[in-house]
């Protein structure tokens, strides 16, 4: 019996995001996942930095998986037809074993900054670092979260962790 699991599915669309967060919690035993999901969610997962659809799911999944948007499925191939288009994506576990930063803090940084996605990092990181954010002189903080790659989020997380330690706060 293998310790790895794969998943091929077509899930209820209203719960697909929660399924992906659970998949991330079990990433060590899920090397590959192929599924048909709502097109909008598939586009968010596969989106790159700079895209309007790039967000929390994009960053967290792409930190651990290579994402391939395979194809779009018309609503007309189903009977009865749903009100939304579908898409098939494949996620294959990348070689990353460790992110190079505190994983729990990474998730917190990604979620916190994207919860205020139209603000610069200088302002969106304040819920974690407080109003007297010691890092705001760094040019990275002039960017908005949707402009950062996964690697830049890892760098940001390391900077936040150092700042928290300097302020005698725990990440």
List where the protein language model places each region:
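Single conserved hydrophobic/aromatic residue that forms the stacking wall/gate
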Residues: 1-5, 9
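Class I S-adenosyl-L-methionine
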Residues: 15-148, 155, 161-171
